[in-house]
């Protein structure tokens, strides 16, 4: 993706030894339930959003994620420009991490949502399947944060 910017799932980051091998300094947990890793010298924050397939309002979950987008993307960018490795950590079967990555592409690559999603699909298997649940969020972020520049 970008130098020093990584994504992993809660299901595989320990086995792949991502934090040590990539010299991660910042972890952004995308989800409500998992505990912080708690290692010394590791900065951790949480984006407390989680799609619940049993009981959800799709528009509301899009708006909830959108409310975290600007600050999270700026936070990632600040650390990357200071050469600090960042890990976005989430659930493999959820789409929130992928939406954050697309938002970063949109913001700093100046590309529209469809192109950002296409680019991510060329780098990662099984993304946005069967469909993207957060297109509204991506479109809103693009219109309000990027297209206005």
Language-model features: where?
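Cysteine-based protein phosphatase catalytic domain of the PTP/DSP
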Residues: 1-86, 103-141, 145
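Gly/Ala-rich beta-loop-alpha elbow adjacent to hydrolase catalytic centers
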Residues: 93
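A eukaryotic "domain-to-IDR transition" signal
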Residues: 97-99
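Intrinsically disordered, low-complexity regulatory segments in eukaryotic proteins
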Residues: 148-149
